[in-house]
């Protein structure tokens, strides 16, 4: 469902939202409703569910993150599509009252009373950081929690595989940590690249190379939260970088150039006429082509 939502966001094709995303996500989220129970303080908890390839847990972080994101996204879809769904109050109640993510001194847990204490290749328990961005760099304390969680995840090395390195790279990139993102991506290369430059790990799977490519995309361009971030997590050793026509949410094509560690040129083409909010390290940028107006909002946001 999240991938379907991104398909809509990158195209802004409302028919995708109405005919595919909304009905599919509605069914997926409503499946969770019988698993919810309310405590004496009115907080909603999940009964025992399964964290992929790890085990069972109540208040499983994997499901809490997806449920919270799903309810918020359904409410947004109803607003966009002008749908008065009878379940909107239920989804809003869940979004308001769903319990916090279980965590301990090592960061995010698998679920209630289930710490992360054996090696695991997936970052299923960290989806709230990426790709859902429910916890993100714009929130106080989230970065420290992310770093603690990733470091603990990789501190148990027995089942840390290629996908673990790309996952950590994506998580660090989401929080603007370009050097750490590159370090983890290089970990993938050291583990899985062969002398002929081809990837090989265990079976005939492709998700690790694809997520490796996505690591580079996330270093160069991010657009979650309806804000285009150009070069948000570029490693310090990448002093000269350029990309052309990468897609951003809101149906934008973005190109940019970075020289000597500074962004010198950004070009944005709107394909759907959506509002454009840009974050950049450019000092006092000016519009040279087109009739767009830059309105400073502080901290490099226009």
Cite the ranges covered by each PLM segment.
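Residues that flank catalytic or metal-binding motifs in active/ligand-binding sites
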Residues: 42, 63, 125-127, 242, ...
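Acidic/histidine-rich catalytic neighborhood
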Residues: 26-80
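Active-site core of glycosidic bond-cleaving carbohydrate-active enzymes
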Residues: 1-15, 19-23, 64-227, 264
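An acidic- and aromatic-residue-enriched active-site/binding cleft used to recognize and process polar
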Residues: 5, 12-13, 21-22, 30, ...
